[in-house]
Amino acid sequence: MRLDKFLKITRIIKRRTIAQQLCDSDNVLVNGKAQKPSYSIKKGDELVVKYFNNTIKAKVLEIPKESLKKEDIGDYVSFEN
């Protein structure tokens, strides 16, 4: 699954176009490296998303096959503080 789509489906970022812009401006790191929106996300990848004044750290647990309900997000992404 594409990185920008994963960010949208897991509700880390609200809109896919914003996810694409963040990736293009090197504000999304996967395993410590800036990645393009087309990067193919894998189970176990560690994400760092810099969004406004926030930094979101997350680990990919599973790749969703479709849009998720809010209560199901924890099955696919583990957030760090």
Stretches found by the model and what they are:
Residues 32, 46, 73-76:
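Short linear motifs in intrinsically disordered/low-complexity regions
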Residues 54-81:
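C-terminal structural segments of small proteins and small subunits
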